[in-house]
Amino acid sequence: MVKISFQPAVAGVKGDKADKASASAPAPASATEILLTPAREEQPPQHRSKRGGSVGGVCYLSMGMVVLLMGLVFASVYIYRYFFLAQLARDNFFRCGVLYEDSLSSQVRTQMELEEDVKIYLDENYERINVPVPQFGGGDPADIIHDFQRGLTAYHDISLDKCYVIELNTTIVLPPRNFWELLMNVKRGTYLPQTYIIQEEMVDTEHVSDKEALGSFIYHLCNGKDTYRLRRRATRRRINKRGAKNCNAIRHFENTFVVETLICGVV
């Protein structure tokens, strides 16, 4: 800033006149000052506004990334639920059949066909088998559960609407993983290779009132139905007819051969 001052001019007069003039005239005006302020130089834009814009851009970018990640998560869940789980369910469900020689019903060996639907639950470690009504006889329709966690097998005879529970026979029933591998190996065709049939005989012993103690899988199968415990007969009798009085037969397979389970009442 520049300061400029102006002083008044002094006339060459005598002192007395000057005194008179100074006495009669008003006091001279003070020196005039003019302040000149130099023009301000144009300031560059503050960095603060630029920093605020950068922060806002980062926030928008972060929000966009969050939305994108959420979209990817939802898409992954959708694909997992509707494609992977559906494919897994298809791989664990089998509709298959087996051709076997029936040597139990008569002396003449006849070729029979057995169909069943199999659901294998690898994580829960159990198998569920549905045997529809046989086309040419040979047993009752049934639902069967092999619970490897509980070590139990349950037969629901659909014709009688009764449930029968017995200890799991691991010498006949393949574990879920082995049974699944067997069925996957033969999934290319409709039927398993031709095989044979064996027979096991059981007798009911007592009525089961506490079905919850049998486990959730068997409970859902047998709830609301008369349920009995079975025991294997130590010495098998010779039964000429599967439809003999006081006995019912269920034919099924959980291995490379067919099993006929005879369930008989106490004689």
Swiss-Prot record:
Could you list this entry's UniProt keywords, alphabetically sorted. Answer: Cell membrane, Cleavage on pair of basic residues, Disulfide bond, Glycoprotein, Lysosome, Membrane, Phosphoprotein, Signal-anchor, Transmembrane, Transmembrane helix
Q: List the disulfide bonds.
A: 163-222
Locate the transmembrane regions by residue number.
Answer: 55-75
- Mainly resides where? membrane
Marked site, Cleavage, at 242-243
Which residues are modified by glycosylation? 169
Phosphothreonine occurs at 37
State any GO BP term from the record: neuron differentiation
The keyword Metal-binding appears for this protein: no
Q: How does it sit in the membrane?
A: Single-pass type II membrane protein
Compartments (UniProt record): Lysosome membrane; Cell membrane
Which SMART domains does the entry mention?
Answer: BRICHOS
Q: Where is the BRICHOS domain?
A: 136-230
Could you describe the post-translational modifications of this protein? Type I membrane-bound, as well as soluble, furin has a pre-eminent role in ITM2C proteolytic processing. PCSK7 and PCSK5 may also be involved although to a lesser extent. The soluble form of PCSK7 is incapable of processing ITM2C. Fails to undergo shedding by ADAM10 and intramembrane cleavage by SPPL2B.
Look up the record and report any one GO term of the cellular component aspect.
lysosome
- GO molecular function annotations of the record: amyloid-beta binding
The annotated subunit structure for this chain is: Interacts with BACE1. Interacts with APP. Interacts with STMN2.
**Record's function text:** Negative regulator of amyloid-beta peptide production. May inhibit the processing of APP by blocking its access to alpha- and beta-secretase. Binding to the beta-secretase-cleaved APP C-terminal fragment is negligible, suggesting that ITM2C is a poor gamma-secretase cleavage inhibitor. May play a role in TNF-induced cell death and neuronal differentiation.
Q: Which PANTHER family match?
A: INTEGRAL MEMBRANE PROTEIN 2C, INTEGRAL TRANSMEMBRANE PROTEIN 2
User: What does the similarity note say?
Assistant: Belongs to the ITM2 family.
Q: What is this protein called?
A: Integral membrane protein 2C
Source organism of this protein record: Macaca fascicularis
Gene, per the UniProt record: ITM2C
